[in-house]
Structures are given as C-alpha cells and as structure tokens.
UniProtKB/Swiss-Prot annotation:
Superkingdom of origin: Bacteria
Keywords, sorted A to Z: Cell inner membrane, Cell membrane, Heme biosynthesis, Membrane, Transferase, Transmembrane, Transmembrane helix
Homology family: Belongs to the UbiA prenyltransferase family. Protoheme IX farnesyltransferase subfamily.
Pathway in which the depicted protein is active: Porphyrin-containing compound metabolism; heme O biosynthesis; heme O from protoheme: step 1/1
MF GO annotations: protoheme IX farnesyltransferase activity
Enzyme Commission number(s) of this protein: 2.5.1.141
HAMAP family registered for this protein in UniProt: CyoE_CtaB
Species of the source: Saccharophagus degradans (strain 2-40 / ATCC 43961 / DSM 17024)
Protein name, per record: Protoheme IX farnesyltransferase
GO BP terms, alphabetized: heme O biosynthetic process
Amino acid sequence: MTEQASISNHDVAGWRDYLELTKPNVVALMLLTSLIGMLLAVPGMVPIDILILGNLGIALCAGSAAAVNHLVDRKVDLKMARTFNRPIAKGRIDPTKAILFAAILGLAGMAILMVWVNHLTAWLTLASLVGYAFIYTFWLKRATPQNIVIGGLAGAAPPLLGWVAVTGEVHGHALLLVLIIFAWTPPHFWALAVHRKEEYANAKIPMLPVTHGEAYTKIQILLYTFILIAVTLLPYATHMLNELYLLGAVVLGIGFLYYAVAMMRNKNKNAGMDAFKYSIVYLMALFVVMLLDHYLLPTNIVS
C-alpha cells in the first residue's frame, strides 16, 4: 500500500469512479435530512420546483465538497484500508480532473440555488461547502483531535439548508435540527475512529483515540450520547413536535446508549463498528419519525 503503487496504476476512470468521488452514501443521508428540513418547514406540501431544485443544488455542492476531500486526502487514503481503493488515491482519476469535476459540481449547484431557489440558501450552502472541504479537510482534520466536533457544524447544515430553501429565512426550529446532527457527529465518528484507530495513527490523523486513547474516547462517546439524547428532546419541549416524535427519540436514544455502554464494557472488538452503523440508522430513523409526527400530529406552530 504505497503511493508509488498508486501512481503506477493507470486504470481508465469510469462513471462509477466519479460517482464515488461525491461520496453518494454520505450525500444521500444529507439529502434525507435536507428533504425533511423542507417538509418540516411548512404545514402542507413543499412546492415541487423547490423540492427538486433545492435538493439538487444542495446535492451537487455536497458532492463537490466530497470530491475536494478525496483530492486533499489522497495520500492519507493510501494508508488506510477503508479508503485505499478510492479513485484518486489509486490513480484512476487524475487530480487535475478531480479539481475540474469538483468545480463543475460546485458551480452548478450554486447556480441552481441562486437562480431557482433563493440567495440565502445558496450562501449558507457555500458556507457549508467551504467549512467541510477547506476548513475541516485542509486544516482541522490534521490539526486537532476535536476536528470532527468543530468541523461537524458544516455537516450538520443540510436540514437548515432545506428549511431555508422553502421559507427564505432562518428559523429557530431549523437550528434545533442542526443542533441534533451537531451533537450526533462526535459519537458517530469517534465510534468509527476507535475501530480504525491503528489506521488513523498510521496516517498521522490526530483522531481522539489516537491522541487520548480508547478509554478516554469511549467516555466521551458516552457523554456525547447523553448530550444527544437531551438535545433530541428539545423539539418536543419547544412544541415543534409531539408525542410520537418524543417516543421515537427516547427509544432510539436508548438504543444509542446501549451501543455506547457496550463500547465501554470492552467485551466485543467490533463494538465500535456496531455503534457506528447504528448511529447511521439512528439519524435516519429519527428524522423519519420527525416527518411522521409532523404530518400525523400537526402543531401549526411553524411559521
């Protein structure tokens, strides 16, 4: 697994390689939260043009940021089994072409948001793109073990972007959705970092388990899980959502707590990966429950 081996690989890039640059699984989760952010913003249905063009613009910008991440991390990716086969790291896509691809996606996404959605959504999306692709990827990721805590704000933006795409303004309820994802990010990524600790250490990425040890990281995961559970109660406490959401948030939160405690007990070497996988299901399910509550038990509070 050397950079020399990667450079000597001259496989022709296919469309799947360019799709992989956009991190489609990550973008899909972001789009779920942006879509639900849109739907929560109004009592009825979102205008179909905003629904389609808003999410398209957000997706293109997210894909652009992901491509920049692939580009910047190409040497790091070679040192990690999880990322060794990425298209730029393996030499299937030339860095220059990757830059052009990222620029086209970003410009297209911004144009769509500016012209057919609204300027506030476009500027907030640009801020999120810059936050992830440049501030996090270029600097924070290599600078501090708190990288994903600080940088997590960019990844937490999609529900706000969706909300603003519909309403044209920032609402407190939209910020609650951001806060939920912001609180979810540390236990989500640190669980993976515990499982992949040796790879991060080999790549010289100062993830928390590398700099402070697994035991300390597991305590932090448990603490952030409690914070996350508390934060997820706020939509009910502020009358944004109702009892159906409260029940779902509590049940899902107990599940997250179970996996955090399982990591603390050190009885399963795959506990970190199990927690990581559950955290993805958790976020998806939580936002779906929000949507069900919104339509089945409308509050008529949102303006």
